[in-house]
């Protein structure tokens, strides 16, 4: 992929922008033919065959911030488009567009603290289709609330959010903020006269409290508590018999719900030593719980997890060079996990097996570790060449091993 960033700072205002193109492939993807599945779950298009999925992403971001006397304000705009496809059966083609806008304001409330407020909005749309060209037949295609092969459209135009916060204008002190976001999305089956099959609503609440203390100008420490709660509700529409290929809506039922909690307590210590050396340590412990329920036929799944982790970093800056190395690791311990379902005549053996396999991995302990290396070299008086290397691995008790390797070369001017 390629990425370009710009930042211009003047006396009373600043501008920034970003442009990105990324081309990649997801290997051996099964039971999901929908892009951005985290956003649209549980109403996904799926099949048991799957395969490699190619994806292209285009992204643009721009922002402006200014200061008038003691008031600071700004805005940020971003747009991302993507296309995902496969050249063999089953052949999904997913196109997405994601437009976001946020505005913020910071006002002093005392000689040491400022009050922050922000609002945001989002427009998201996805067209999700799947086709078969083989003469040997087709595989079964599933909607996770039904089955069949259809041309689907996801359209969401009800995203809004906001946050309130307080931060200090000094190098040490308290920082706090709370935020709320709401997103709704409707699944429409276009081949059935734009039939509105189901809709999903997601409420997200988040909060953060941080304290930072500087010691003699060369050392600092801090502690942070964060919390996040997400409520997701899925409503399925009920239709009568078709007349002239039009299905009348006769009711609706809230069938799916999920509750996700996450608490995190972290700290940091940072020290600046002689000859440009800098050291830091960041311990953290996370607690999370996810509980999902489908009303009829009754199905439940819940997982609790505690994850301690630590990150260590060292860096050195000289006249022309900057070097930084960070290593970290975590260990996730799951407990009190539960899976329950009521046998039903509409059960699908393949889909049920995939669901149980997913639960097995979610309720499995795992260990993860990573390393990040950055090397920057000044070229002339106005340019900088930077190399970034990153590698990590997660090992699950279910014998799954996930490896992540990334390398980047940047030219800054």
What kind of feature is each model-predicted range?
Residues 1-2, 54-60, 93-101, 156-162, ...:
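Residues that define the transmembrane beta-barrel architecture of outer-membrane proteins
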Residues 2-8, 60-66, 101-107, 162-170, ...:
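Residues on the lipid-exposed face of transmembrane beta-strands in outer-membrane beta-barrel proteins
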Residues 13-19, 71-77, 113-119, 172-178, ...:
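Transmembrane beta-strands of outer-membrane beta-barrel proteins
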Residues 21-25, 66-70, 79-83, 121-125, ...:
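Transmembrane beta-strands of outer-membrane beta-barrel pores
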Residues 28-34, 85-93, 128-135, 186-195, ...:
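Outer-membrane beta-barrel translocator domains and adjoining extracellular loop/strand segments
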Residues 31-44, 118-158, 182-199, 239-246:
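Short, flexible helix-coil linker/hinge segments at the edges of structured domains or between repeats
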Residues 111, 401-413:
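Outer-membrane beta-barrel "beta-signal"
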Residues 149-285:
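Long, internal scaffold/assembly segments composed of regular secondary structure
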């Amino acid at each position: 992929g390629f990425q370009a960033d710009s930042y211009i700072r003047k006396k009373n205002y600043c501008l920034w922008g970003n442009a990105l193109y990324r081309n990649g492939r997801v290997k051996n993807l099964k039971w999901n033919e929908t892009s951005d599945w985290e956003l649209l779950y549980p109403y996904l298009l799926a099949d048991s065959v799957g395969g490699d999925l190619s994806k292209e992403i285009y992204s643009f971001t721009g922002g402006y911030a200014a200061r008038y006397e003691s008031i600071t304000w700004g805005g940020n705009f971003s747009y991302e488009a993507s296309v995902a496809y496969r050249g063999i059966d089953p052949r999904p083609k997913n196109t997405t567009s994601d437009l976001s806008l946020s505005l913020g304001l910071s006002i002093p409330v005392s000689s040491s603290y400022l009050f922050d407020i922000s609002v945001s909005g989002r427009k998201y749309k996805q067209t999700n289709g799947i086709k078969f060209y083989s003469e040997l037949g087709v595989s079964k295609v599933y909607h996770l609330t039904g089955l069949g092969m259809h041309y689907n459209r996801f359209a969401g135009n009800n995203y809004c959010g906001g946050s309130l916060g307080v931060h200090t204008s000094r190098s040490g002190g308290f920082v706090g903020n709370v935020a709320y976001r709401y997103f709704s999305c409707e699944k429409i089956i276009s081949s059935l006269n734009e039939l509105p099959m189901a809709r999903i609503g997601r409420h997200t609440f988040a909060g953060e409290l941080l304290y930072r203390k500087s010691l003699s100008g060369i050392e600092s420490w801090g502690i942070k508590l964060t919390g996040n709660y997400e409520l997701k509700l899925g409503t399925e529409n009920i239709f009568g018999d078709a007349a002239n290929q039009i299905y009348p809506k006769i009711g609706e039922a809230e069938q799916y719900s999920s509750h996700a909690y996450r608490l995190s307590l972290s700290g940091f210590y940072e020290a600046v030593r002689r000859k440009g050396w800098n050291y830091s340590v960041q311990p953290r412990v996370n607690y999370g719980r996810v509980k999902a329920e489908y009303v009829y036929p009754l199905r439940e799944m819940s997982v609790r997890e505690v994850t301690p982790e630590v990150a260590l970093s060292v860096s050195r800056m000289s006249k022309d060079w900057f070097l930084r190395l960070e290593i970290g690791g975590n260990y996730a311990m799951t407990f009190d996990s539960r899976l329950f379902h009521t046998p039903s005549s509409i059960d699908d053996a393949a889909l049920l097996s995939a669901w149980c396999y997913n639960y097995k991995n979610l309720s499995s302990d795992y260990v993860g570790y990573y390393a990040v290396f950055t090397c920057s070299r000044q070229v002339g008086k106005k340019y900088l060449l930077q190399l970034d290397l990153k590698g990590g691995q997660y090992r699950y008790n279910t014998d799954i091993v996930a490896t992540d390797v990334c390398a980047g070369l940047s030219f800054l001017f």
